[in-house]
Amino acid sequence: MKIGIIGGTGPAGSGLALRLNVAGYDVVIGSRDKARSIEKVKELQALWPTHNLTITGGDNGDAVNCDLVVVATPWDSTATIVGEFASQLAGKIVVTMANALVKVGKEFQPLVPPRGSIAAHVQAEIPLSKVVAALQHLPAKELGNLNHHVDSDVLICSDHPEAIETVSDIVERIPGCRPLNTGRLSNALALEAFTAVMLQMNVRYKTRVAPRMTGLPDIDPISGRNLKI
């Protein structure tokens, strides 16, 4: 499977590209400026020379032509950018990892978009795509450090069960990550808003927190997925 990352030159996008490529996926980093994405790939390859990275740099058009697409742009441009590629994204799984947040004084606070979440707005812009909300809570700095062991549950929601399964399979290949199905896309409001809580804890406790749910069975009774980690 080839995975494209729109806006993949930022910390979250490039960190995710690293993890996915090391996990065995072909990855294309997209950007409005193709030269910038090519430079980012060279930077990653120089930083991690022993991992034989095969990430490709391209523009956002190259990213949307992949089998599955992740949108890693700032939240206020996510829906607009995917809307530009609505026809190319038709029928594809599109993962949004955006959070609508604002900093008020020293605190992060969630913003509630008119449609309830960034993910819902994206689904409205590309109605023929299978939009999935996921990856909002993975710390970008840790993702981009291959010497750091990621230790996090990844909460996933979508109106398309088969898309949740596909994204879960991908997440499961990142060591330390456990995918959890959190239901329909309407729950993206809660996933996105919870990021503000996590960031506030980071500030207060001078650390980087990640979600880890307890009380789950070893096996998901619906999908049969092994929930052990």
Stretches found by the model and what they are:
Residues 47-56, 127-130, 177:
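A short helix-to-beta-strand connector/capping loop
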Residues 48-93, 100-106:
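Rossmann-like NAD(P)-binding element
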Residues 107-115, 145-162:
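Short beta-strand and adjoining strand-loop segment in the mid-core
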